[in-house]
Protein backbone atom coordinates (compact mmCIF):
# COMPACT_ATOMS: atom_id res chain seq x y z
CA UNK A 1 0.00 0.00 0.00
CA UNK A 2 1.33 3.42 -0.94
CA UNK A 3 1.28 6.41 1.35
CA UNK A 4 0.73 9.89 -0.03
CA UNK A 5 4.44 10.68 -0.11
CA UNK A 6 5.16 7.51 -2.12
CA UNK A 7 2.60 8.23 -4.83
CA UNK A 8 3.70 9.20 -8.31
CA UNK A 9 4.14 12.78 -9.37
CA UNK A 10 1.00 12.36 -11.47
CA UNK A 11 -1.92 12.33 -9.03
CA UNK A 12 -5.09 10.45 -9.83
CA UNK A 13 -7.41 13.22 -8.63
CA UNK A 14 -7.51 16.63 -10.25
CA UNK A 15 -6.68 19.80 -8.37
CA UNK A 16 -9.68 21.65 -9.85
CA UNK A 17 -12.04 19.19 -8.18
CA UNK A 18 -10.39 19.93 -4.82
CA UNK A 19 -11.00 23.66 -5.27
CA UNK A 20 -14.67 22.94 -6.10
CA UNK A 21 -15.13 20.71 -3.06
CA UNK A 22 -13.65 23.27 -0.68
CA UNK A 23 -15.67 26.10 -2.25
CA UNK A 24 -18.90 24.06 -2.04
CA UNK A 25 -18.23 23.82 1.69
CA UNK A 26 -18.04 27.60 1.99
CA UNK A 27 -14.39 28.39 1.32
CA UNK A 28 -14.25 31.75 -0.45
CA UNK A 29 -10.57 31.61 -1.32
CA UNK A 30 -8.51 28.44 -1.52
CA UNK A 31 -4.73 28.28 -1.63
CA UNK A 32 -3.04 25.86 -4.00
CA UNK A 33 -1.39 24.23 -0.98
CA UNK A 34 -4.79 23.59 0.63
CA UNK A 35 -6.22 22.07 -2.54
CA UNK A 36 -3.11 19.92 -2.99
CA UNK A 37 -3.21 18.74 0.63
CA UNK A 38 -6.88 17.74 0.28
CA UNK A 39 -5.99 15.84 -2.90
CA UNK A 40 -3.18 13.96 -1.15
CA UNK A 41 -5.40 13.05 1.80
CA UNK A 42 -8.28 11.89 -0.40
CA UNK A 43 -5.91 9.82 -2.56
CA UNK A 44 -4.51 8.15 0.56
CA UNK A 45 -8.03 7.38 1.80
CA UNK A 46 -9.06 6.07 -1.63
CA UNK A 47 -5.97 3.85 -1.74
CA UNK A 48 -6.72 2.38 1.68
CA UNK A 49 -10.38 1.77 0.80
CA UNK A 50 -9.40 0.19 -2.52
CA UNK A 51 -6.78 -2.07 -0.93
CA UNK A 52 -9.31 -3.38 1.56
CA UNK A 53 -12.00 -3.75 -1.13
CA UNK A 54 -9.60 -5.90 -3.17
CA UNK A 55 -8.97 -8.07 -0.09
CA UNK A 56 -12.72 -8.42 0.48
CA UNK A 57 -13.35 -9.49 -3.12
CA UNK A 58 -10.51 -12.02 -2.98
CA UNK A 59 -11.88 -13.38 0.30
CA UNK A 60 -15.26 -13.78 -1.42
CA UNK A 61 -13.59 -15.67 -4.28
CA UNK A 62 -14.13 -12.91 -6.84
CA UNK A 63 -11.83 -10.99 -9.14
CA UNK A 64 -14.37 -8.21 -9.62
CA UNK A 65 -14.54 -5.42 -7.06
CA UNK A 66 -18.19 -4.67 -6.37
CA UNK A 67 -19.80 -1.56 -4.95
CA UNK A 68 -20.53 -3.40 -1.72
CA UNK A 69 -16.80 -4.14 -1.33
CA UNK A 70 -16.07 -0.42 -1.55
CA UNK A 71 -18.92 0.40 0.84
CA UNK A 72 -17.79 -2.14 3.44
CA UNK A 73 -14.15 -1.12 3.14
CA UNK A 74 -15.08 2.56 3.57
CA UNK A 75 -17.27 1.74 6.56
CA UNK A 76 -14.43 -0.25 8.16
CA UNK A 77 -11.98 2.61 7.57
CA UNK A 78 -14.38 5.20 9.00
CA UNK A 79 -14.97 3.02 12.06
CA UNK A 80 -11.21 2.98 12.67
CA UNK A 81 -11.10 6.77 12.54
CA UNK A 82 -13.90 7.32 15.03
Question: Which residue ranges define each predicted feature?
Answer:
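Intrinsically disordered, low-complexity terminal regions
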Residues: 1-82
Amino acid sequence: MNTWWEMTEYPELGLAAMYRIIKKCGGERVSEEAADQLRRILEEIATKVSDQAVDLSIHAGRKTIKAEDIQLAAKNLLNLIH
